[in-house]
Amino acid sequence: DCMPDTLLDYLEELNRQTFLLVEYGRESTDDATLARINRGHTFACTEDAVRRTAGRGILTGGHVILGLPGEDSEKLIQQAETLSQLPLTTLKMHQLQLIKGTRMAHEFAFHLYAVDEYIDLVIDYIEHLRADLVLEWFVSQSPKELLIAPDWGLKNHEFTARLKRRMEERDAWQGKQLK
């Protein structure tokens, strides 16, 4: 997530000619988590890149994984509030997925969310996000032959329909709990 000024200069010029959105895959706001998953940067580095990109008038997006080891719901709520303070236009989020052949797959001594548990986590999370932040997606799907877990057997649109129903049941909306 290093963004040199020369590249920002180019993107700023390109942004004048066409639609452009730069997405940063930050995955987490917790530096200990970022080190554990070998991201090679701190949150401060990503925050700087986001602010400099948005400061050039470029639409800026983010991407996070919910359910990384060591990140409980309390940490994730704090993460949502932290992200709400950044000049992000869009946010993509998805569940942690264990993929065959990865280091994390060999460890697998941590909690993975069941679908209904994850739906409630997503609702808690988005209640702490700015209302104007465009949420692009809530889940990701890996190829079945590579996926160890979780296998919820849902397409993205099916998950989103369940999420919407649960939000209505809970009288929840984006930004409801943001301080």
Regions from the PLM with identified roles:
Residues 1-5, 69, 140-145:
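Short, internal active-site loops enriched in acidic
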Residues 1-50, 54-55:
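Conserved SAM/AdoMet-binding glycine-rich loop
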Residues 7, 34-36, 72-74, 146-148:
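A short acidic (Asp/Glu
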Residues 13-17, 42-45, 81, 110-112, ...:
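Short, low-complexity, polar/charged sequence segments that are solvent-exposed and flexible
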Residues 28, 32-34, 61-64, 105:
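N-terminal small/glycine-rich loop or linker at the start of catalytic domains
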Residues 34, 38, 69, 106-111:
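Short helix/strand-bridging catalytic loops that position acidic/His residues to coordinate divalent metals
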Residues 44-103, 116-141:
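Conserved C-terminal portion of the radical SAM core fold
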Residues 90, 98-179:
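Auxiliary Fe-S-binding modules of radical SAM enzymes
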